[in-house]
Amino acid sequence: MAKTAWKISGQYYETCSCDFVCPCIPGQMAVSPTKGSCTFAMAFQVERGSYGNVALDGLGFIVLALTPEAMGKGNWSAGIIADERASAEQRDAITAIASGAAGGPMAALSGLIGKFLGVESAPIHFDRNGAKWSVKASSLVDMAAEAAMGINPHATEPLQLDHTGHPAADRFTLAHASQSHVHALGLSWDDTSGKNNGQYAPFSWQSA
């Protein structure tokens, strides 16, 4: 049976509990997170998208996960927050894409998930003002970050990391997380130290 063709694009935002800069990408997921384990929230603001005949324009979703040790060792606990405006068909499409069940970039991570925590619905609000951004999903997720700049005090472009192999985007902007609050699907994490990692980028995914 042929898989459903799909394509989505928009903006991706993430914070994690690792100190800035997160070591997991340059360490090829073989090194321990800076706090031993890592909790992360990857938020996706879909500007244009479809899953078969199901339109996904304007919706959002957040992938939450806890990795108990080095990411490459697996045994992640992961779940999804879907936009409460999504219909049942749209929610199913978001779940298939975000979990990797529909193929695409997230399929590369699906084998690392030991426990799927399920799907919860909430209003998801994205706010972007220049180098600052925030994502809020009711009382479940509330995170914000600001782009990281280099040593040149006159720089106008933020630091970027390229050729990452990250499923969200191969190239993204590094950011300092100003706050991260996650209380959803059995996961709990709060940080307002300003020392944690953030990153963001445009994203474009499609089925294989």
Question: What does each model-found stretch correspond to?
Answer:
Residues 2-49:
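N-terminal ordered "arm"
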Residues 151-208:
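Extended, charged low-complexity segments
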Residues 13-17, 33-34, 50-55, 106-107, ...:
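N-terminal start-of-chain detector that recognizes signal peptides
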Residues 54-62, 86, 120-126, 175-180:
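Noncatalytic linker/hinge segments flanking ATPase motor cores
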Residues 46-52, 75-76, 110-115, 156, ...:
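Short C-terminal domain-edge/linker segments immediately following a structured domain
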Residues 32-37, 69-74, 118-136, 173, ...:
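Short, surface-exposed loop and linker segments with low hydrophobicity and enrichment for Pro/Ser/Thr
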Residues 36-107:
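Aromatic- and glycine-enriched beta-alpha-beta binding-site module
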Residues 76-159:
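Charged linear interaction tracts used for macromolecular binding and regulation
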